[in-house]
Amino acid sequence: CRLLTEEGYRAQLTKVGQDPLRKDADVEALWAKVHKSRRSIGSLMMDQHLYAGVGNIYRAETLFRHGLSPFLPGRDVSRETFDATWTDLVDLMEYGVQHGRIDTVRPEHSPEAMGREPRKDDHGGEVYVYRRAGLPCYVCGTPVAERVMEGRNLFWCPTCQPAP
């Protein structure tokens, strides 16, 4: 921990990526970096110099909700899909802050709608793929897959999120 001057603080802020919870996030700057990158979208979303504060759960869940393979290169993500995932991140993360839990499951896949038991996990929310490796996908029934990416466990559905 160190004390920063105002200039030092501003200099550090320039190293931080775009935060979906900030109204002043520069989505155009983020798009420019994602659109040029050969790195996978799953990797890019864990890069705090690009996506500030997104983290592992929101990465896995947002990619699932949009049918995006975490292995798709950033440059192959369309602008329409990029905008849709950004908007979804904003909505999901704002909901998480307001409710103190991470819920990413759409109403039609809720425990009540599907007649299933609620998820029991330490983060306390309903999710599609996060920490569900080997369990059937709520949408298609394929077992959820898991692998390490960017030093974190990545979860995805191989059917709903087909490889590029």
Predicted segment positions?
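Phosphate/anion-contacting hairpin/loop surfaces
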Residues: 1-68, 73-76, 80, 85
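A broadly conserved sequence feature marking short terminus-proximal activation segments
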Residues: 72-131
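Residues immediately within or flanking Cys/His clusters that coordinate Zn2+
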Residues: 134, 154
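Short cysteine-rich clusters marking metal-coordination/redox-active sites
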Residues: 137-140, 157-160
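Short functional micro-motifs and their immediate structural scaffolds
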Residues: 144-145
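Short metal-binding segments enriched for Cys and/or His
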Residues: 163-164
